[in-house]
Curated annotation (Swiss-Prot):
Topological region Extracellular: 61-415
S-S pairs: none
Glycosylation sites per record: 159
Posttranslational modification: Glycosylated in vitro.
Protein's membrane topology: Single-pass type II membrane protein
Record family assignment: Belongs to the strictosidine synthase family.
Segments for region (Disordered): 1-29
Name of the gene encoding the protein in the UniProt record: Apmap
Protein task: Exhibits strong arylesterase activity with beta-naphthyl acetate and phenyl acetate. May play a role in adipocyte differentiation.
Modification sites for Phosphothreonine: 19
Name of protein: Adipocyte plasma membrane-associated protein
Topology Cytoplasmic: residue spans: 2-39
Amino acid sequence: MSEADGLRQRRPLRPQVVTDDGQVPEVKEGSSFSGRVFRMTFLMLAVSLAIPLLGAMMLLESPIDPQSFSFKEPPFMFGVLHPNTKLRQAERLFENQLSGPESIVNIGDVLFTGTADGRVVKLENGEIETIARFGSGPCKTRDDEPTCGRPLGIRAGPNGTLFVVDAYKGLFEVNPQKRSVKLLLSSETPIEGKKMSFVNDLTVTRDGRKIYFTDSSSKWQRRDYLLLVMEATDDGRLLEYDTVTKEVKVLLDQLQFPNGVQLSPEEDFVLVAETTMARIRRVYVSGLMKGGADMFVENMPGFPDNIRPSSSGGYWVAAATIRANPGFSMLDFLSDKPFIKRMIFKMFSQETVMKFVPRYSLVLEVSDSGAFRRSLHDPDGQVVTYVSEAHEHDGYLYLGSFRSPFICRLSLQSI
């Protein structure tokens, strides 16, 4: 062995380095150990933060006391319920000039609606004219609603007047020619010991004597409608008001968000949408079955809002939220999970939760026996959003909305 060879053998080892060919460094075990320490430290920190946060959430008061219930499996969306895009053929009218035109009625070719800023307006020849207001301003935020007022259901009476319910103020008669307003029944008036907190929709006999209307809850106001749905409160009622005697009767109570109402053509029964339960009840108001009630449509593919007559002898039913099958329905999923619903509303506002509700608009035509005749869809709300009513007039459907800044018009001939 040469001296040079010996020197090379005694040369100290150098640390191995990572090269482009992917050699593993000699410090692998040390690096893995450091990574495990970091992950363990992070996990312990996360747990130490999560436990007091969870404890604080448990101490927070939930705005709702949800009731547990369950739905049947939603109907499969095939046949007449098969998804389509027919509602996208509608045109928007008065876009960004109206706010939440929930319900629509016509006298001749003149349309009337109520808006989120507390007005009842006339729509004629492309112009908007205010004809009534039941409250006073300001009308900018949800906190203003009780003083501002919120006109919802609107109907035409036999003498050229309008009957309107305001969610906060009560039942009114409006003369659109004179711009006069007459209070028929104040929401401050207790009915059988209960106040009316959310007056919603109405239907009127042809002679104008009887008015059937819904009070959706004696606990929740309109501005808290999502809390009403999520809590599944069963304190809603269907009521009858006699314009001659001024008497008020409770026809049906313990309803879960009673919403839209519609008299039958023979005026022997009233249909009432029970939104939370995705069904429509039938209440008999004359004839041999007077005083009785039964189910008209059960287990609907959407949560029904207003009901209006169709020219075929059936009814148009609007639904702003569907129960997709196949698919996922958040309301179905949460129905028997009150703990989760409490936690959701401890953490998030109604407006935040609404952002997670699909903007799927659905209009159903139902026969006089309660069978589905056809369905009109806008699966992602491209044109029609937050639909609340389908009002048929002169070959068109006029579509109201409880949130959108427009109404829509759909030609029935085009579908």
